[in-house]
C-alpha cells in the first residue's frame, strides 16, 4: 500500500507542477543538462538531485530583518521568462512583493553558482478563491521584475492542458529543499523523489483525510507503506511525457 509522499520523510515548503507537453507554451519542459531520468531516482525518502535535473525549480525567499538577509520560504516553478507559479499558502502575511526574491538555477540552497539568477518580485497574484482552511485554489503567481534568460540550468515547465486528467498510480516526480521534520532545517541540496498518484477514495478514507480532499486536489505517495500520511494539498508534480515534462 502507498503512503502519502515518502512515509519516512516528508517535504515542507515545496511546490510542484505537472510536467506536461503543452503546445500553447511552445518550448518548455526540457532538461538540457540531463538526458534521462536516472533509474536510481526511485528511492523512498528522496535523494540529492543532479545539477540541472529540474531547471524550472525556484527558491522563493523572503527578507527577514532578524536574520539580516533572505531566507528560503517555499519552492515554485518557472512557467515563462518572468513568472513563477507557487502555492498561495506559502505567502502567509508577506503579501508585499518587495519582501521577496526568486532564486532560479539554484542547486545548493546556500551556495549560488554561475548559473544562478536572482530576481526581485514586481507583483504577487493570489487566487481570488483561495481558502486557507481547506487549501482550495491554493495557487499564487509571482511576477518578476526582470526577464529571465533560459540556459541549460534554467528552463520553464509546461502547464497542463485544462482537459488533462492524471490516472491513478501515474508516476510523477517531486523536488525541493523541504524539511524532513516539521521543525527541522531545509535540505542544503535540491532533493528529488518518485511518487505515484493515489486514488482519492484512499486519501479520503476514515483513517486519513475523511473526505476533505476534493477532485480539484491531488494525492500522491510512494509504495513503501501506508503507516504514515503526510501531504500538502494541491501541490504540483512533475510527470514525464513523450516530448518533455
Regions found by a protein language model. Give the residues of each.
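Extracellular trypsin-like serine protease catalytic domains
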Residues: 34-43, 57-68, 161, 170-245
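Gly/Ser-enriched beta-turn/beta-hairpin loop segments
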Residues: 48, 111-116, 133-136, 151, ...
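Active-site substrate-binding loop(s) of clan PA
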Residues: 113, 126-131, 147-187
Amino acid at each position: 500500500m502507498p503512503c502519502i509522499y515518502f512515509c519516512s520523510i516528508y517535504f515542507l515548503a515545496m511546490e510542484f507542477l505537472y510536467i506536461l507537453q503543452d503546445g500553447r507554451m511552445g518550448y518548455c519542459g526540457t532538461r538540457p543538462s540531463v538526458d534521462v531520468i536516472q533509474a536510481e531516482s526511485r528511492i523512498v525518502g528522496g535523494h540529492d538531485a543532479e545539477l540541472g535535473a529540474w531547471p524550472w525549480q525556484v527558491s522563493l525567499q523572503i527578507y527577514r530583518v532578524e536574520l539580516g538577509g533572505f531566507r528560503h520560504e517555499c519552492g515554485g516553478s518557472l512557467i515563462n521568462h518572468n513568472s513563477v507559479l507557487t502555492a498561495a499558502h506559502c505567502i502567509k502575511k508577506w503579501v508585499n512583493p518587495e519582501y521577496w526574491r526568486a532564486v532560479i538555477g539554484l542547486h545548493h540552497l546556500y551556495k549560488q553558482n554561475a548559473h544562478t539568477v536572482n530576481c526581485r518580485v514586481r507583483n504577487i497574484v493570489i487566487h481570488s478563491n483561495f481558502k486557507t482552511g481547506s487549501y482550495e485554489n491554493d495557487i499564487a503567481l509571482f511576477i518578476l521584475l526582470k526577464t529571465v534568460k533560459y540556459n541549460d540550468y534554467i528552463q520553464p515547465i509546461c502547464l497542463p492542458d485544462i482537459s488533462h486528467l492524471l490516472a491513478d498510480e501515474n508516476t510523477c516526480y517531486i523536488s525541493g529543499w523541504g524539511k524532513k521534520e516539521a521543525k527541522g532545517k531545509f535540505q542544503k541540496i535540491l532533493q528529488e523523489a518518485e511518487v505515484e498518484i493515489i486514488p482519492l477514495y484512499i486519501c479520503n478514507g476514515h483513517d486519513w483525510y475523511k473526505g476533505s480532499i476534493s477532485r480539484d486536489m491531488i494525492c500522491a505517495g510512494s509504495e513503501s507503506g501506508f503507516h504514515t500520511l503526510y501531504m500538502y494539498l494541491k501541490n504540483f508534480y512533475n510527470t514525464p511525457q513523450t516530448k518533455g515534462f
